[in-house]
């Protein structure tokens, strides 16, 4: 492989066992990065690593375990070198409705989607600040822009991540560290294959990764896609409540 600006630089991708995370890890490795790929299932990681031999190293991890995240960050740097790009992507989704409201599921969503990303920032952020370089990418969602039926817990965590990124961006850039936030719409993955409701502007994983890679290369703060869904969600969020709820009521599944 010819040397490129990314050759042998280290990227850490969580949630790399499937979906967007898996595709991102593979694309980064093909671009020359040394990729530390994390997920809960070792078998998924080993299969991924075999696709780009010598460029992807597996680091099995449960992102809800703060101590394990700290140890994994240290192990990656000891094994591969300084982490220059960190994409925190692990996530879970439990449909939340009036009929099935569950505190336990809400907590699980917060622990994985929000605190999982913060736990992984723990070993990365101080090192990047000390080295005065690096790029941290948080995986949020367009559902973080406005509350939608069934997405109370999921959307809340994504809204929180958008806020975290907005707060950190001007602060971390003082130390040469770039902060980005990814806001995908509906992407065809094993997770969305389970959805029983309409998914407007659905795109495939390769197209999603194209958007993400372009945004990361440009060091954009916000990487939102597809544009049709992003525009629709921003418009919905801007509406007065009476109009907003008139629309979101129609999104409630199996409404009687």
Show where each model-derived region lies.
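Active-site helix of classical SDR
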Residues: 121, 157
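The beta1-alpha1 cofactor-binding region of Rossmann-like NAD(H)/NADP(H)-dependent oxidoreductases
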Residues: 61-71, 103
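Conserved glycine-rich Rossmann-like NAD(P)H-binding loop of the short-chain dehydrogenase/reductase
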Residues: 31-47
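Substrate-binding pocket helix/loop in short-chain dehydrogenase/reductase
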Residues: 97-98, 102-110
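Residue(s) in the substrate-gating loop at a strand-loop-helix junction
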Residues: 141
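Conserved glycine-rich cofactor-binding loop
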Residues: 15-18
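C-terminal helical subdomain
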Residues: 181, 197-232
């Amino acid at each position: 492989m010819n040397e490129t600006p990314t050759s042998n630089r280290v990227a850490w991708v969580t949630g790399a066992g499937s979906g967007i995370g898996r595709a991102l890890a593979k694309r980064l490795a093909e671009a020359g990065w040394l990729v530390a790929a994390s997920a809960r299932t070792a078998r998924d990681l080993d299969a991924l690593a075999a696709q780009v031999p010598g460029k992807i190293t597996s680091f099995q991890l449960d992102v809800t375990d703060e101590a394990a995240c700290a140890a994994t960050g240290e192990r990656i740097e000891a094994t591969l070198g300084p982490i220059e790009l960190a994409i925190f992507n692990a996530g879970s989704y439990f449909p939340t409705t009036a009929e099935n409201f569950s505190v336990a599921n809400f907590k699980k969503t917060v622990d994985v989607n929000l605190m999982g990303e913060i736990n992984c920032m723990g070993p990365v952020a101080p090192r990047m600040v000390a080295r005065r370089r690096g790029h941290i990418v948080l995986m949020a969602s367009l559902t973080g822009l406005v509350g939608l039926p069934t997405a109370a817990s999921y959307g809340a965590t994504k809204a929180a991540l958008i806020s975290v990124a907005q707060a950190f961006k001007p602060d971390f850039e003082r130390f040469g560290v770039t902060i980005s936030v990814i806001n995908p719409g509906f992407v065809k993955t094993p997770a969305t294959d389970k959805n029983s409701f309409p998914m407007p502007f659905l795109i495939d994983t390769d197209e999603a990764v194209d958007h993400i890679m372009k945004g990361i290369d440009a060091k954009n703060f916000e990487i939102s896609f597809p544009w049709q869904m992003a525009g629709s969600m921003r418009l919905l969020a801007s509406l007065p409540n009476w109009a907003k709820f008139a629309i979101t009521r129609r999104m409630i599944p199996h409404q009687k």
